Amino acid sequence: MIHKQQLQAYLQLTRIDRPIGIYLVLWPALWALWLAADGMPPMSILIIFILGAVIMRSAGCVINDYADRHFDGYVTRTCARPLATGQLTERQALKFFFVLCLLAFGLVLFLNPFTILLSLGAVGLAILYPFMKRHTFWPQAFLGAAFAWAIPMAFAAIQNQVPWQAWVIFGVTLVWALVYDTAYAVADKEDDVKLGIKSTAILFGDRVQEIIGFFQAIMLLGFLWIGDLFGLSWLYYGSVLIAAGFFVYHQYLLSFDQPQKAFKAFLNNHWVGLVILIGIMLDTL
C-alpha cells in the first residue's frame, strides 16, 4: 500500500510539477509529426506521442536521480530530492523506472513494428545519459540524443521509414539541447566542480556565453535548412525570426554571468520550440 507521503515522493521524483522537460521533449516530436504527415497527424498517433513524452520524461528524471543519488545531497538545488532525503529507496526508484518504461512501451505497441523497434533506442539513451556526467564533459550531447530520439520515431510512425531529412531535425534538436542544458548546467557549476561531475558549462569555462551563441547560430541555420528541405513558406520563416529574437534575449540573460539568469534562459528556451511548432502548423494548414 502506497501512503500519501510516498505518493508525493514518487510524483516529486518524476518532476511532473515542472513541465519544462516535457515541453523540451514534446515540441521537437511534434515538429517531426507535422512535417512527416505534411499537416495534422492522425489523432491516435498524436495522443501516443504526447503521452509518451510525458511518461518517458518522467522515467528519465527517475533514472537521473538514481544515477545522482550519491551526489544530490551535496548540491543545494537537489538536496531535497526523494532519493537524497531517503523518502524512497534505490530499489523503489528502479522499480518505478521500469514501470514507467513498460507503460511507454505499451503505448508504442499501438504503432507499427519499425517504430516499436526504434523505441528500444529511447530507453537505452534514457539510461545512458545520466551516467555520462562522470565520464565526459559532453553529457548534454547525450541528453540531446535522448530528447531527439522521438524524431525518427515520429517519421517511422507516420511514414514507416526514417528519411535522411529526419536526421537533420534530429541534429538541430541535439544542438538545441547543448544550448539549453549548458545554460542549465551553469546553475550547478560550482557544486559540480567540487563533486567531479562533468558538463559543457565547465568545459566552456569563461567562454560559455559565446559558445552557446555559436550553437544558437547553428540552430538557426538548421531551421532555415529544414524550411528549405520541406518546402515551407514565409509563415515558418517568420517563426524562425521570432526564435532568433528569443536567442537574443537569452544572450542578454547570460551576459550577467549569474546562475539565476542562466537558469531563466534555460526555462525560456521552450518558447523557441513552441514558436517553431506554431510556424510549422500554420504552414501546413
Curated annotation (Swiss-Prot):
Major localization listed first in the record, in broad terms: membrane
Cofactor: Mg(2+)
Residue runs in coiled coils: none
Domain of life assignment: Bacteria
Keywords attached to this entry: Cell inner membrane, Cell membrane, Magnesium, Membrane, Transferase, Transmembrane, Transmembrane helix, Ubiquinone biosynthesis
EC number assigned by the record: 2.5.1.39
Example of a GO MF term: 4-hydroxybenzoate polyprenyltransferase activity
BP GO annotations: ubiquinone biosynthetic process
Membrane disposition: Multi-pass membrane protein
Cellular compartments per GO CC: plasma membrane
Pfam families for this protein: UbiA
Subcellular location: Cell inner membrane
Catalytic reactions of this protein: all-trans-octaprenyl diphosphate + 4-hydroxybenzoate = 4-hydroxy-3-(all-trans-octaprenyl)benzoate + diphosphate
Function per UniProt: Catalyzes the prenylation of para-hydroxybenzoate (PHB) with an all-trans polyprenyl group. Mediates the second step in the final reaction sequence of ubiquinone-8 (UQ-8) biosynthesis, which is the condensation of the polyisoprenoid side chain with PHB, generating the first membrane-bound Q intermediate 3-octaprenyl-4-hydroxybenzoate.
Family matches, as NCBIfam families: ubiA_proteo
Protein name in UniProt: 4-hydroxybenzoate octaprenyltransferase
Biological classification of the source: Bacteria, Pseudomonadati, Pseudomonadota, Gammaproteobacteria, Thiotrichales
